[in-house]
Amino acid sequence: MTAAWVSRVSMSPPLIMVSIAPSRYTLELIRRNGEFAVNIVGETLEKTAYGIFGSRTGRGIDKIAESRVKARRGEKTVVPLLEEATVALECKLVKTVEAGDHVLVIGEVVNALKFSEEQPIVFTP
């Protein structure tokens, strides 16, 4: 899933927030598994981020296989990390908060990996 809203919540402990629509399969998986990753991508994966990860559900397809992006299991979690991302943040779920038409997913960053020097893309509405 491509997230439009990601923000730091706390430095100690290191917490981040991702805003996810309640209908998203990603939210179901996060609640079930108690962990997630935020893969921050650069221009190399921009079309893939929006075209496959951002617009299609993973309920019926393997998005990683379809995108042909190299991925590996996290070091501190079992979630996939995209090796072509600039940075990957492994997170343990702390809590979810219903907020209007989205759910705020708050996670503690338990590991951060830098894969490249590429500048990350930033979504600007």
Regions found by a protein language model. Name each.
Residues 1-125:
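Basic, polyanion-binding surface patches
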